Amino acid sequence: MGDKLRLSIGILGNGASLLLYTAPIVTFSRVFKKKSTEEFSCFPYVMTLFNCLIYTWYGLPIVSHLWENLPLVTINGVGILLESIFIFIYFYYASPKEKIKVGVTFVPVIVGFGLTTAISALVFDDHRHRKSFVGSVGLVASISMYGSPLVVMKKVIETRSVEYMPFYLSFFSFLASSLWLAYGLLSHDLFLASPNMVATPLGILQLILYFKYKNKKDLAPTTMVITKRNDHDDKNKATLEFVVDVDRNSDTNEKNSNNASSI
């Protein structure tokens, strides 16, 4: 009964993770359409790739016992493919400055994964020590992946806008981490359960922020130039220009702008 329940939770976790990995398709369709990465960050996708690489390796028979963690291999293998595509698209449309940022995070991830596989395969002789080593690296990778939206959450709080924190990405992150937490506990595997003990509360926090700010727009000031012309003297037409800051979230300023435009 326990094994069947664990397998069922693993299948549900696969489904939730698949939704999590495919959620950025909406974001990258926007990037592709506008041919710009705008204010989106590539850091979460690079960290997700690192997580997928580590846990695919963790689930293979060279680290785990036989195919006891097959669900990890299947879903993280798909994740590697999807995240690689997302990172390529981001890099292609990113500004030169953003491309440097991608390289600074992407190269250490690949080097870190290479070292992890080499050390676990060549230094340790048994599954127990390999799982302990790779699982420890996976713990860091998972916390980095689930914690990477903290950068976006900070932006949400500053701008009071959820434009760059899509709902489905936050929801599927919470759902996937909750299911993998249950899977790890049922498997008595702390290396699977521990990172999701951190990820689940972070997912809840993202959802709280989303629902708090979802109906609010960016509060960044917008500059408007209003011109008033004096037509009493055709030869000397005076033009008065002044600048006002418009708070797009303020009904009062909207009314003042409408009145000013009718002068």
UniProtKB/Swiss-Prot annotation:
It comes from Arabidopsis thaliana. It comes from the Eukaryota. PANTHER family: BIDIRECTIONAL SUGAR TRANSPORTER SWEET3, RAG1-ACTIVATING PROTEIN 1. This is Bidirectional sugar transporter SWEET3. Mediates both low-affinity uptake and efflux of sugar across the plasma membrane. Belongs to the SWEET sugar transporter family. Forms heterooligomers with SWEET11, SWEET13 and SWEET17. The chain crosses the membrane at residues 8-28, 43-63, 72-92, 104-124, 133-153, 166-186, 191-211. InterPro entries: SWEET, SWEET_rpt. Residues 29-42, 93-103, 154-165, 212-263 are cytoplasmic. Pfam families: MtN3_slv. Residues 9-97, 133-217 form the MtN3/slv domain. GO terms for cellular component: plasma membrane. It is found in: Cell membrane. Keywords: Cell membrane, Membrane, Repeat, Sugar transport, Transmembrane, Transmembrane helix, Transport. It is a multi-pass membrane protein. GO terms for molecular function: sugar transmembrane transporter activity. Residues 1-7, 64-71, 125-132, 187-190 are extracellular.
